[in-house]
Design a protein with these regions (language model features):
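Hinge/cleft segment of the Venus flytrap/periplasmic-binding protein
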Residues: 2-10, 20-24, 118-167
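A general structural signal for well-ordered alpha-helical segments in protein cores
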Residues: 14-15, 70, 100, 120-124
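Conserved donor sugar-nucleotide recognition element shared by glycan-biosynthetic enzymes
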Residues: 10-14, 40, 44, 120
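Beta-strand segments within the central parallel beta-sheet cores of soluble alpha/beta enzyme folds
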Residues: 1-3, 32, 87-91, 148
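Short beta-strand elements at the ligand-binding edges of bilobed clamshell
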Residues: 1-5, 34, 105-117
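Hydrophobic alpha-helical
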Residues: 18, 37-101
Length: 167
């Protein structure tokens, strides 16, 4: 597990829910290592390089709290001479353009779209409610009257075309 900034809410939640998803699916897991890479590709590459030296072929899956760290893990594997078909199953979060390209190339198995446009729409709706003198907690669908949750969408090779910019 490549985690973002220590104590950062997104890093904590992405780590927690990745683990919960595996447990819910009853996937047998042996955790070999986890470390913070502070959302940075270079730091993630260094961590992965260390793990490859320590664990070698025992690494089957790498969860990264963002796409840059997932790409850093891929960089380390390829720099170590690993063939694409031998890469661990690596996933990230954010559906950034470089990550989508890596999904298309087959080096990144998937990412999760962090819906910036949807977040902006929710922020605008909250602002409009407040400016209109309304309580957003009662006029909008907010959890506990405070939180706007958006669904995350998994992006894999199967649905990649939906997320690529139109040419």
């Amino acid at each position: 597990m490549l985690e973002g900034e220590p104590g950062h809410q997104d890093a904590l939640m992405r780590t927690e829910y990745s683990v919960k998803a595996l447990m819910t699916a009853a996937v047998p897991v042996e955790k070999l290592a986890n470390d913070n890479a502070n959302w940075e590709r270079g730091q993630a590459s260094l961590r992965m390089e260390q793990w490859l030296q320590e664990f070698g072929d025992a690494i089957e899956v790498v969860f990264a709290n963002n796409d840059d760290m997932a790409l850093g893990a891929i960089d380390a594997c390829l720099d170590a001479g690993m063939e694409q078909e031998d890469l661990p199953f690596i996933v990230g979060v954010d559906a950034t353009p470089p990550a989508l390209e890596a999904v298309a190339q087959g080096t990144l198995q998937g990412t999760v779209q962090n819906d910036a446009a949807g977040q902006a729409e929710q922020i605008l709706a909250i602002c409009c409610a407040v400016m209109g003198g309304k309580d957003p907690g009662t006029t909008l669908n907010l959890e506990d009257g405070k939180y706007a949750w958006l669904e995350y969408t998994t992006v894999t090779a199967e649905n990649l075309a939906e997320f690529l910019p139109e040419e």
